[in-house]
Amino acid sequence: MKLPVILSFLLLAAGLSADKKEKGFKSVFNGKDFDGWAGPVDNYQIVEGAIQCKKGKGGTIYTKEIYANFVVRFEFKLPPGGNNGLAIRYPGKGDTAYHGMCELQVLDSEHPRYAKLDKRQYHGSAYGMAAAKRGHLKKAGEWNEQEVTVKGSTIRVVLNGTEILNADLSKVKEFMGGKPHPGMNRKEGHFGFAGHSDPVSFRNIRIKKLK
C-alpha cells in the first residue's frame, strides 16, 4: 500500500474515533453570546470565543437547561492566581458550593496566595467536601482540558487526561469548617460557572446527558 493511501486511512480512522468519543455531546455555548444562559451574564464577557469573568465581577451564570446525570467537557484558562468554580446541579440561586450539589474548584492551585488552603479547596475538589489530586494543571495562561462526570451522588473529574477526583458525596461526613452542605443530595439542576472576580476563561463547552 502506498504511503499517501496509508496516511489517508489513518487520518480517516482518527476522525472516526474522535467522532465516536464526541457522540451524544451537545455544545451549550455558541462562542458569540450568552444565548441559553441565565444569571448575571453582564458580569461576564466573550473574549476570542470564550466565556470570561470580568475582572472584579462575578456571580454564577448557568445553563437554562437542567441536568440530572451528565458529562461535561470543556477547556479553561487561568490567569495567575485565578479563581472560579463549576456549579453542579445548581438550583439557580444561592451559593452553589452549599445550595447546589457542589462547586468544583477551578483554581491556580500553585499560586503562592493559596499555599495554606484546606486540601478540599484546591483545583478539581468538591469545595469543602472532597479533595482532588494536585499536580496536573498546566501553567497559568495555558489552556487545560477537563471532563466532569456526574452520576447519582458520584463525581469524577479528569484533568488533562488524568483522573484527579472520584468521589461519592453521599459518603462525605466531615465538612470543611464543620459547615453542612444542604444541597449535596440534589438530583438535578443547572450547570454553570461561579466567578470570583478573576478573568478565568472557558470554551468548547459540551454536555452529554446520561441515564
Which residue stretches match the model-derived regions?
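Hydrophobic h-region of N-terminal signal peptides that target proteins for export
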Residues: F9-S17
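Carbohydrate-interacting regions of secretory-pathway proteins
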Residues: S17-K211
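Sec-dependent signal peptide recognition
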Residues: M1-S8
